[in-house]
Amino acid sequence: MMSYEGNGDGVAISTENHNENYISLESSPFHEDSKSRESHDLKKDSSKISEKDNENGRDKDGNKDRDREKDRDREKSRDRDREKSRDRDRDRERSKDRQRDRHHRDRHRDRSRERSEKRDDLDDDHHRRSRDRDRRRSRDRDREVRHRRRSRSRSRSRSERRSRSEHRHKSEHRSRSRSRSRSKSKRRSGFDMAPPDMLAATAVAAAGQVPSVPTTATIPGMFSNMFPMVPGQQLGALPVLPVQAMTQQATRHARRVYVGGLPPTANEQSVSTFFSQVMSAIGGNTAGPGDAVVNVYINHEKKFAFVEMRSVEEASNAMALDGIILEGVPVKVRRPTDYNPSLAATLGPSQPNPNLNLGAVGLSSGSTGGLEGPDRIFVGGLPYYFTEVQIRELLESFGPLRGFNLVKDRETGNSKGYAFCVYQDPSVTDIACAALNGIKMGDKTLTVRRAIQGAIQPKPEQEEVLLYAQQQIALQRLMFQPGGTPTKIVCLTQVVTADDLRDDEEYAEIMEDMRQEGGKFGNLVNVVIPRPNPDHDPTPGVGKVFLEYADVDGSSKARSGMNGRKFGGNQVVAVYYPEDKYAQGDYED
């Protein structure tokens, strides 16, 4: 280094020396060693700091890793929660879908069931309507058959009279037209049209005009004692003599007789002459002088004839001619199929006069009305107060009679308590005997058997018919109680069946028919028709119809007017019913 002189130089030297000294200090070994230590310490500290920093960094990194791990765990937990939530949502949706499907299936099942039930109801309704239509058609066919049978019978008589008088032909034509119109109108009700005399009786009774019965015979075929009243007897309403019964048309059914088994050579004129002469010979012309026969119709193919007499009494006398010989051939004399014994009893006697001189024509006095033969029935033990009409009603519960004879005292005319009868259908004979024999009638017990001993017992297939007949006899006994009086209740039997009453529409129609028909005879208070139980348990009174009237006068007219009528092809039996049993709802016999 450059050296300076003087003071100034001295300063300069001093400064330089100071720097040298300073440099000397710095460059001294101690100083270097200290510096080295410091540096080492600094490095150590720096290393520690660095290590701490590293440790802190590592801690921070660890914390961050832990935080990240926690975050991942939390995220996973949230993911699991979200997944569970989504699963729950999916389960809820599936449950809702299942519920919707179940509801849809249930609703579909309900609709299917409703449709099936509707179809079943429609099928049932169709079947019921079809059954009702079939039942109504059957009733209409039955009525039409009866109408055609009556029309054929009337037309046969008219065809024969047509040749005699054109005027009478026109009259018959008008009568036939009226009859056809009546036949059509009757289809509106289950009841048949009442015969003309019954309609007139109803009309007269409804108007309160009961004509008096004449005390002397003023009309052919009628006589003063045709309505005897015996004390203690139950007759119901007194038979009324209608105006129409005085005409030929109204009494024709009771004035005709059937003659079967005619010889091939017989004709209308020969038959008419023969029976007129025979009636005169036996004393059967009770209507006065002249021919008893007014008309004859012959069916040559079937060899039978219908012979029409002047009066009801003469027709009954002609019934005693059964078996008479006509041109060498024995002929059968019977009542025609349209003969109504209940109505005929109000027009005149229904049995031959017991004083006829049958021996004058070669017949025995015992051959009254076809009562001979193996099927003749003896009916004994009859109460003396029983009338002929009552006994016939009892016997005809089993079928129409071919002949009947109530034996009476010749002097007094009173019943001797026994009778004979023959049924048109011989198969009914044993059934009637078995059902009637032993029945109590008042203070008497009936004895009913074949008049010829050795009667055949009922066949097994007849047992059901026998049971039914016994039930009907029990009903008939209600009418024949001695000293009894008519009640306000009329019971109709043999009217309807249990099947008819199960259908509501059919039941309503039957109820309406009964109200309309029953109301014609008086003040009808109520109609009771017991119906069968749906569970098929026995129901008392099923098959019967009970008519309640305000007074006995109405019930008496109804009983007389409806007994023997036809309803739906069945013949009605009308009897009085005890008022106390009816009030208690007891409809059993």
UniProtKB/Swiss-Prot annotation:
What protein is this chain from?
Splicing factor U2af large subunit B
Assembly information from the UniProt record: Component of the spliceosome. Interacts with SF1 in the nucleus.
* Compartment annotation: Nucleus; Nucleus speckle
| MF terms (GO), sorted A to Z | RNA binding
Q: Which Pfam families match?
A: RRM_1
Signal peptide span: none
Q: Which spans does this entry mark as compositional bias, Basic and acidic residues?
A: 29-100, 109-145
Indicate whether Cell division appears among the record's keywords.
no
Its cellular-component GO annotations read: nuclear speck; nucleus; spliceosomal complex
Q: In which organism is this protein found?
A: Arabidopsis thaliana
Q: Where is the RRM domain?
A: 255-338, 375-453, 494-580
Q: What is known of its domains?
A: N-terminal RS domain has a very strong bias in favor of D over S.
Composition bias of kind Polar residues appears in: 14-27
Q: Which GO terms describe its biological process?
A: mRNA splicing, via spliceosome; response to abscisic acid
What biological function has been recorded for the protein in this entry?
Necessary for the splicing of pre-mRNA.
**UniProt KW Repeat keyword:** yes
Report the PROSITE patterns cross-referenced here.
Answer: RRM
Residue span of region Disordered: 1-195
List compositional bias (Basic residues) regions by residue number: 146-156, 164-188
- On the tree of life, the source organism's domain of life is Eukaryota
Q: Which UniProt keywords apply?
A: mRNA processing, mRNA splicing, Nucleus, Repeat, RNA-binding, Spliceosome
Family named by the database record: Belongs to the splicing factor SR family.
